[in-house]
């Protein structure tokens, strides 16, 4: 009789273990947000992007009109312990997207493909900006901006990016790790960063930015809008 009782206990433990496994599988299936993470594939289809900050106010900086009528670009922003994530949603007819590829840091002047870019002033001191650009074909450009508007593409960083083409436009996804550049230590829970996004549309040869300028204007770094991010 005692032996039989122990067997029943053992069977019950197996049953409970199997039940817990089934419950865990159900949670993963029906609550992917609890277990997912952003994969840099250009698709922007992870649950995390649904709660991202959004920016959709742009100025036309080439030609330099500062017109604010552009509404075909949306920026998504997230951050975690790995770094800062940026998603670009670019609406335009598919047959106008320029996917020409180039070697790293080439294809700037003249540009040969549609581009998304971001310049980051991590210390928000208007001294140094780090620029990261990906074109629709997946080619990249990176470098620094100093002395307000002087560009130097000799600097190369270790960052991730990907693009994807859809029927109504294209998207890009960028991860800039916190280790990409030296940053001043801050004692607060949040870090204030200067930031400017831009989009180049080759078929129209127009550039739109979230700051009122570009490196080709007299003022650039000093006119960056700022955002606050968690201080990891």
Model-derived regions: residue spans:
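Bacterial N-terminal signal peptides
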Residues: 22-33
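Positively charged n-region of N-terminal signal peptides that target proteins for export
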Residues: 11-12, 16-22
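Single conserved hydrophobic/aromatic residue that forms the stacking wall/gate
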Residues: 1-13
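Structural preference for beta-rich elements and adjacent junctions enriched in aromatics
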Residues: 36-232
